[in-house]
């Protein structure tokens, strides 16, 4: 949760930065100004990241639309963010929204081995001064690939793309404090019981082990970086 909240907040702030010419953008200020129409922000996914991105965007006076697929969450978002438009996913609706948006922000995780939800053709039809920010990674937007903090953006189909996987590294002090609050109980469990017993007793901790003895043991991490994965098991901790 805390990393999603930080990533969602930073995603909107980065969109603002990369709309400016000194960062390779088109020279667009994503801010509501007197006498000018408010820029449009389309957020795919209404979880913790999407909610925080929407809060930043609404604070800037932007027109915000959130696309969510679960009716319960749609109702929650409409209650929490009355100034935002929250819609259920429908291909024709989403594609039309994308063609008119200034900032497209993806927070949806892809299902492995499933086709991209947003094709290259859809991206090609976007406004040429738009910005795409993807805080998740590959698999949702066809033209998206991972970037780094040292080289965060690229142009594809005339649209600026940003896909930094470790965005919370931009604010390490805040991220460390937030992560410690969330991970503290797990750290204490490992210190008290040892890693093997702690993992055996807590499925969430077991599923969170990413690397061990120089090997990637988490399938999603390996897949995202095109590296081999050694499936994790408790016997590896003997």
Task: Go through the PLM ranges and name each one.
Residues 12, 53-54, 74, 123, ...:
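Generic hydrophobic/aromatic pocket-lining and core-packing "Φ" positions
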Residues 1-14, 18-30, 139-238:
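Adenosine-phosphate binding glycine-rich loop
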Residues 70, 111, 167:
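Residue-level "edge-of-site" marker
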Residues 2-9, 47, 51, 67, ...:
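Electropositive phosphate-/nucleotide-binding environments in soluble metabolic enzymes
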Residues 79-158:
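Rossmann-like adenosine-cofactor binding region
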Residues 24-108:
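Glycine-rich phosphate/diphosphate-binding loop of Rossmann-like nucleotide-binding domains
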């Amino acid at each position: 949760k805390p990393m999603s909240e930080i990533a969602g907040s930073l995603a909107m702030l980065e969109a603002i930065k990369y709309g400016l010419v000194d960062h390779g953008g088109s020279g667009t200020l994503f801010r509501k100004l007197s006498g000018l129409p408010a820029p449009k922000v389309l957020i795919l996914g209404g979880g913790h990241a999407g909610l925080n991105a929407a809060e930043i965007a609404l604070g800037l006076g932007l027109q915000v639309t959130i696309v969510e697929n679960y009716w319960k969450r749609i109702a929650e978002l409409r209650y929490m963010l009355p100034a935002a438009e929250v819609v259920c996913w429908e291909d024709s609706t989403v594609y039309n929204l994308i063609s008119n948006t200034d900032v497209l922000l993806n927070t949806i995780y892809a299902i492995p081995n499933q086709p991209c939800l947003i094709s290259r053709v859809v991206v090609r039809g976007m406004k040429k001064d738009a910005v795409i920010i993807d805080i998740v990674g590959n698999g949702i937007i066809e033209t998206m690939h991972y970037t780094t903090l040292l080289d965060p953006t690229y142009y594809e189909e005339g649209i600026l793309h940003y896909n930094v996987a470790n965005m919370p590294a931009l604010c390490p002090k805040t991220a460390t404090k937030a992560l410690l609050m969330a991970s503290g109980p797990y750290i204490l469990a490992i210190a008290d019981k040892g890693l093997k017993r702690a993992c055996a007793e807590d499925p969430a901790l077991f599923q969170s082990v990413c690397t061990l003895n120089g090997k990637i043991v988490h399938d999603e991490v390996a897949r995202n970086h095109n590296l081999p994965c050694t499936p994790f098991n408790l016997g590896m901790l003997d």
